[in-house]
Amino acid sequence: MLGVPFIDRWLSETFKPKTFDDAVDRLSYVTTATLLAFFSIMVSCKQYVGSAIQCWMPMEFKGGWEQYAEDYCFIQNTFFIPERSEIPGDVEDRQKAEIGYYQWVPIVLAIQAFMFYLPSWIWSSLYKQCGLDFPSVISEAEALRSQDSETRTKGVNKLVDFIGDILDTRSKNEYGRFYCYRFGKGLGSMTSMLYICIKLMYLANVFVQFIILNKFLGNETFLWGFHTFADLYAGREWQDSGVFPRVTLCDFSVRKLANVHRYTVQCVLMINMFNEKIYLFIWFWFVFVLITTFINTLCTIYRLSFDSSRHNYIRSLLSGPVNNFKDEKAMIASFANNGLKQDGVLLMRFIDDHAGAMVTKEICEELFKKHGENLQHNRDFHHGHSTKSTSPGLEEGHHEHLYTPEKMKLMAPDYPIKHA
């Protein structure tokens, strides 16, 4: 990417995309984190390998004195006074005009890059506790895209069996509820709630990034980037605005025998020419990431939290005999709420994003068939033994109307039914 083998390899391995996320997640932890890391490395090379500061010294300064003064001014900050203004004689007034951020730009950029990567790292560390191996399932689904029809069918059946095993153990692992969410390992709602929290972390991180920019650069408004761009467009340069000044002043003292001599020198900060362009780009990029992340977070919450959204999505994946009749709507609701649940719908969306709609439809249709077969088996068991049904969710009063005898047509789809 950068043309430098070591840096290219390090960035690629560090900010490698994952399979269990969406494009907006990757916008933060891959694209933005890589950009910030690249800017950090670029500024570091200019600052510590090249010449970060050059000062105009008095005539009596020779060799080592000049190097000492430049190193001192770079470390101890410089201050900016507009050319048309008089240099204040009071030390406190000079300290108020100090610019102390340019030395820390590489470090702050590196910290910001890590902050964009942090939610992804937390997500990767915690999702395994929810009982579902997302990477394996999604990777297997991705591999099916390039297979022929017969091989893909066998692969789909294996995947469906694997997911079905998790579906069969969901009731044993659930141990709590919160509104429409169920807690526990397996396919309940634990993973979905965790993913929503991660989405909120991505969103909160962008807000924090704007606060960091303001505090670090000493701005009083969150519209700094817009104002700076407006100044540049209007021809108002740094000499007047004081934003990333190239020419600054520096005070330092030199002890000669028993006397201390105070000097004020004028310095050139070429690094600020890069910093201005970098931070102006970063500000507008953060605005784009903020808007995109905000919209995506709202959409994710809606898609995972509202029954209507989950039902509509599942209906779009089923190309079989699913019409808008009441019974068939109830069947889809049973499959989405008691079969897949929120975590299963989230898995279907990840597979859809990475493996494509065709593979996702085949997997979802097979899972739907298995769900219908399980309902038929439970219905037969219920009528044959006159006992309470063990169908998922029935003991909680959900979808009891699905299991009445007058709705036999719902339990008799056009695919073969397996009886226990």
Curated annotation (Swiss-Prot):
Domain of life: Eukaryota
GO molecular function per UniProt: actin filament binding; gap junction channel activity; gap junction hemi-channel activity
Phenotype seen when the gene is deleted: RNAi-mediated knockdown impairs gap junction function in pharyngeal muscles which disrupts the synchronized muscle contraction between the pharyngeal metacorpus and terminal bulbs and thereby decreases the pharyngeal pumping rate.
Cell compartment(s), UniProt: Cell membrane; Cell junction, Gap junction
Tissue expr: Evenly distributed along the adjoining membranes of the two pm5 pharyngeal muscle cells.
Pfam families the record matches: Innexin
GO biological process: embryonic morphogenesis; monoatomic ion transmembrane transport; positive regulation of nematode pharyngeal pumping
Region: Disordered, residue numbers: 378-405
Keyword Transport among UniProt keywords: yes
Role, per record: Structural component of gap junctions. Plays a role in maintaining gap junction activity to promote phayngeal muscle contraction.
Name recorded for this polypeptide: Innexin-3
Annotated source species: Caenorhabditis elegans
